């Protein structure tokens, strides 16, 4: 039983170390936080023809605290990765809008991150 617990602890520590290294790597080479990366990855994976995403869907899918995603979207908007606006039909909803040019930039950036990370 202790052997199984030890192996589980080792796996957990490896994941923590990998996450820590990824955070440092993103910050140093791309000026991104891990939360920024997760939002950009979401936008790439769930790309759609309209380039529109609801903030609540991003928060729900990524599964981390809402305030962290809101902060990340604000940072990414300031850097030009995306635009955000209120839903004209329901002002409580925030819509993330990504142009074709922005999508291409995000896709290239994520490819560069994945190539350099390996």
UniProtKB/Swiss-Prot annotation:
InterPro entries, sorted: MarR/SlyA-like, SarA/Rot_dom, Transc_reg_Sar_Rot_HTH, WH-like_DNA-bd_sf, WH_DNA-bd_sf
Short name of any one Pfam family annotated for the protein: Staph_reg_Sar_Rot
Protein source organism: Staphylococcus aureus (strain MSSA476)
Main subcellular location: cytoplasm
Molecular function terms from GO: DNA binding; DNA-binding transcription factor activity
Domain of life: Bacteria
Biological processes per GO annotation: response to stress
Family as reported in the entry's similarity comment: Belongs to the SarA family.
Summary of the function given for this chain in its UniProt record: Transcriptional regulator acting as an intermediary between major regulators SarA and agr and virulence genes. Represses alpha-hemolysin (hla) gene expression.
Compartments where found: Cytoplasm
Keywords recorded for this protein, A-Z: Activator, Cytoplasm, DNA-binding, Repressor, Transcription, Transcription regulation, Virulence
Name of the molecule in the record: HTH-type transcriptional regulator SarT
A GO cellular component annotation in the UniProt record: cytoplasm
NCBIfam families reported in the protein's UniProt record: Staph_reg_Sar
Lineage of producing organism: Bacteria, Bacillati, Bacillota, Bacilli, Bacillales
DNA-binding region: 55-78
Gene name of the record: sarT
């Amino acid at each position: 039983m202790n052997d199984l617990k030890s192996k589980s602890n080792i796996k957990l520590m490896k994941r923590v170390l990998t996450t820590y290294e990824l955070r440092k790597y993103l910050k140093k080479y791309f000026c991104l936080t891990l939360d920024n990366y997760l939002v950009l990855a979401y936008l790439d994976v769930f790309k759609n023809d309209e380039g529109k995403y609801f903030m609540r869907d991003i928060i729900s899918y990524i599964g981390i605290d809402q305030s962290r995603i809101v902060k990340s979207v604000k940072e990414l908007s300031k850097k030009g990765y995306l635009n955000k606006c209120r839903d004209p039909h329901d002002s409580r909803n925030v819509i993330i809008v990504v142009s074709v040019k922005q999508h291409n930039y995000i896709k290239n950036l994520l490819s560069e991150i994945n190539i350099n990370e390996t």
